[in-house]
Amino acid sequence: MAYEIIDNIAAEGAPYYTPAQDPPAGTQTSGSTKVFTPITIRGVTFPNRLFLAPLCQYSAKDGYATDWHLTHLGGIIQRGPGLSMVEATAVQNHGRITPQDVGLWEDGQIEPLKRITTFAHSQSQKIGIQLSHAGRKASCVSPWLSINAVAAKEVGGWPDNIVAPSAIAQEAGVNPVPKAFTKEDIEELKNDFLAAAKRAIRAGFDVIEIHAAHGYLLHQFLSPVSNQRTDEYGGSFENRIRVVLEIIDLIRGEIPETTPILVRVSATDWFEYDAQFKDEFPESWTVEQTCKLAQILPKHGVDLVDVSSGGIHPKSAIAIKAGPAYQVDLAKQVKKAVGDSVLVSAVGGIKTGHLAEEVLQSGIDVVRAGRWFQQNPGLVRAFANELGVEVKMANQIDWSFKGRGKNGHKKSP
C-alpha cells in the first residue's frame, strides 16, 4: 500500500527541531478588526497591532539573561503578539535599575539573549529589545521587596556610583545624591548605547527601542525636574533633548536600515495638571514638549513613538489618575501633532479586546500591553475571542481547538 507523504516540516534556520509556523501565530484568519490587521515598518511586517510591552523581570545574573527570561517570554511569543519586546536592558553596568537587571554592556551577554531571539524566529515571530540606563533610579532592590529601597553594596548594589544629568536625588533623604554627568561621561554614554545596539543586532533582534521614559536617565535629561544643567545638555528644550537625538543618530547610522527604531517617552510628568504639584515643580516635562519632540524624532530615523507617562519623581505617581486606557488621551495628542510622519503606540490599562479595538479605530497605530500579558500569556487569543474573530495559534496549540487536519499540510520539498 502506498501512503501519502505528509511531513511535519521543520522551521527554517532553527538549530533544533520545531514545527514551522505558517502563517505565524497571531495572524487573523477570519473576521475583520484593526487589532489583527498587519502593520509593516521598514519592510518588517508584524502580523497584528497588539505588541508586548517590555517587562522587567529582575531575574538576571550579572546582566546575563537566564532560563526564566527564555521561558517567560517564550510562553508569550509562541502565542502571537505582533511584536515582543525584551525588558529594559542596561547599556552600562551601573545603569541597571537593580542588580538583577539584564544588560548588554559586554559581548558575553549576547549569547543568552540569542537563545530568546532564536526561539522567536523559530516561531516566525518578531522580537525587539529596549535599551536603557536607569540614571538616578539605579541600584534599587526588586519592587516586590520594597517601594523605593536602595540596593546596598552587600547585595550587589552600587549606591556610591549613581549618575544623573544633575546632582539631584530621586527622592531627597531616601535615594543617594547622584554624580552629575561630565561631558566625558555623556560621550561614553552615547558610545555605550551604540555598542549595546550593535550587540542587539548580533543577538538577532528585529527591533531596537530606546527607553526615554519612566524617570530613567534619558527622561531625566528631558525633564527640568531632574535636569538643571547650564551647558548644552540643559536649560532650553533643544538642549534637554540633545542627548536623546545624538544617541538615536549614532544608532540609526550604524544598524541596518531595515531595523525599526522605537522610542518610549513619558508624555508628561503629570505635574502640569495639578495645582499642588505645579507649585512645587513649576517646570516639568509636559505633553506640549512631548508633541514637539515627537515631530522631530522621525527626522532622525525613528519609526514609532510609544507614549507612556510619569516616573520622574515619586510624587508623579500620586498625580497620575490611573484607570482603563488612562494614557490613551496622551497618545492621541501626540498622534494629532505628528500625523502620518511617525507611528504612535498607546499603552496602559488596555486590558480588553474591545478597548484595544476602540483605541486603534481612534487613529492610534499600535496598542501595547505589559501586565496583562504577564497575567495571561494567551492574551492574543483572548482578545480575538472577545472581538469574535479567528486568529492562528501555534500548530501545537491550534489543532486541539480546531480539530485534526484543519490546518492542511504542505508536501515536503
Curated annotation (Swiss-Prot):
Q: What function is annotated for this protein?
A: NADH:flavin oxidoreductase; part of the gene cluster that mediates the biosynthesis of butenolide, a mycotoxin that shows antibiotic activity but does not seem to play a major role in the spread of head blight in wheat. Butenolide is derived from glutamic acid via a 4-acetamido-2-butenoic acid intermediate.
Annotated GO MF terms: FMN binding; NADP binding; NADPH dehydrogenase activity
Give the protein's cofactors.
Answer: FMN
Q: What keywords appear on the UniProt entry?
A: Flavoprotein, FMN, NADP, Oxidoreductase
Q: What induces it?
A: Highly expressed under trichothecene-producing conditions.
- Protein name according to UniProt: NADH:flavin oxidoreductase FG08077
Which stretch is the leader sequence?
none
Native organism is Gibberella zeae (strain ATCC MYA-4620 / CBS 123657 / FGSC 9075 / NRRL 31084 / PH-1)
Listed binding positions for FMN are A53, P54, L55, C56, A88, Q130, R264, G370, R371
Name the Enzyme Commission number(s) assigned to this protein. 1.6.-.-
Family, as annotated? Belongs to the NADH:flavin oxidoreductase/NADH oxidase family. NamA subfamily.
EC class of the enzyme, as a word: oxidoreductase
Provide the residue positions that the database annotates as binding substrate: Y58, H211, A212, A213, H214
Keyword Calcium part of the UniProt annotation: no
- Pathway this chain belongs to: Mycotoxin biosynthesis
